[in-house]
Amino acid sequence: MASRMGMVAIVSLFVCALVASTSVNANVWQTDEDAFYSTNKLGVNGNMEMAQQQSGFIGHRPRLASFNRASKQLDSEKRPVPSGPDPIHHSIPSHAPQHPPSYGKAPYEDDRSRASPGLSNPIGPPPFLDRY
């Protein structure tokens, strides 16, 4: 029984190796021609046109990401970063304080009012004294 399982394992590995080698050989990019030089086409894009014809690729390839600086600033300069909220996207009314309010005590007076409000005091959101 162990020898039969060993034979099955060896044969399955052989079949997998055979399938893997034929799929690598079928790859259209595995050619003998030079990567940057083509003798039958003139111009810079001769190889790209040849590869497009061989693989049926239609259209242009996407550009790779560029990590060049978008601005023409010197490397020693830092970009100006605005401080505070953007007035275009965050409209702040003139009567609102510039800093968030700090509460001296909790919105509820004591723990008993929160635990058992009774019928006259329903549970709801805490009262906010100052809103933006």
Curated annotation (Swiss-Prot):
Official protein name in the record: CLAVATA3/ESR (CLE)-related protein ESR2
This protein's encoding gene: ESR2
Family affiliation: Belongs to the CLV3/ESR signal peptide family.
Source organism: Zea mays
Signal peptide bounds: 1-26
Glycosylation (residues): P85
Gene Ontology BP, a term: cell-cell signaling involved in cell fate commitment
Gene Ontology molecular function, alphabetical: receptor serine/threonine kinase binding
Composition bias type Pro residues, residue spans: 123-132
Region Disordered: start-end pairs: 68-132
Hydroxyproline PTM positions: P82, P85
UniProt keyword annotations, A-Z: Developmental protein, Differentiation, Glycoprotein, Hydroxylation, Secreted, Signal
Any one cellular-component term (Gene Ontology): apoplast
Keyword Metal-binding: no
